[in-house]
Amino acid sequence: MTRNPVVAGMFYPAEYHELLEMIEYCYLNPRGPRELPSKRGKYTKPLGIVSPHAGYIYSGPVAAHGYKKISENISGEITAIILGPNHTGLGSGIATMKGTWKTPFGDMEIDNEFADRLWKECDILDMDENSHLREHSIEVQLPFLKHLEDLNIAKFKFVPISMMMQDYESCIDVGYVIAKVARELNRKIVIIASTDFSHYEPQEQASKKDAVVIKDILELNDEEIFTDVVTHTISMCGYGPVIAMVKAMKDLGARTSYLLYYSTSGDVTKDYSEVVGYASLLIK
């Protein structure tokens, strides 16, 4: 199947040159890394990032921090496993798919072999295109990857995993199988957990709540991520993808983590009465 973008022209520009200008703006912005990716790194081990998925004007500079780090630690052919929450309610509880996704920068091919192995080895994961047709949380990550590809930093395929079902056991199962398949196929991988943090709360309250779960991520404590999201009623839409990513990264040997940047929508709108939190984190 070929999937067409559904939020191009809304969350990010639909036209090539306008999108390139926006991506460069995200990197050079004061809330971004303040420099463009300029050279490929050397891939030595899997990387995991937490990346936001709001409109680029709000969260793009925060996301750019993670992609800058990816650019410094990859080379050659990379499979990007992208986990995102299912906001639409369409399709299966947890699902991948095979085929191609279109972007304004060109097509992104799915690593069909990896997706097929996930489906065969994970009982709770379906092969379901409907889960992905209208969902934006994975789509908004792709232009950043295609931009790195256009800079000749790496060549990407990807695997989309949409998660409507985010109970702890399911997230752990997904993370376990991602790591297992990556080892068995000997893939060079990055794992991207797409999430925003607190939604529509006052700045002070949102930042305090988000600090709790960010601490859990930095400690690679997947169980505490789930517990604190529930206990502190943190309106983080993609905690399941984050838990699955952390589990997979730990199984693949990750031991270190970094908070690259935290910001809120209030830093753009200057309205701090109801903000959305965005964070970029690196695990390796």
UniProtKB/Swiss-Prot annotation:
Domain of life: Archaea
Pfam name, any one: Memo
Entry similarity comment: Belongs to the MEMO1 family.
HAMAP family, sorted: MEMO1
Name of protein: MEMO1 family protein MMP1387
Native source species: Methanococcus maripaludis (strain DSM 14266 / JCM 13030 / NBRC 101832 / S2 / LL)
Lineage, highest ranks first: Archaea, Methanobacteriati, Methanobacteriota, Methanomada group, Methanococci
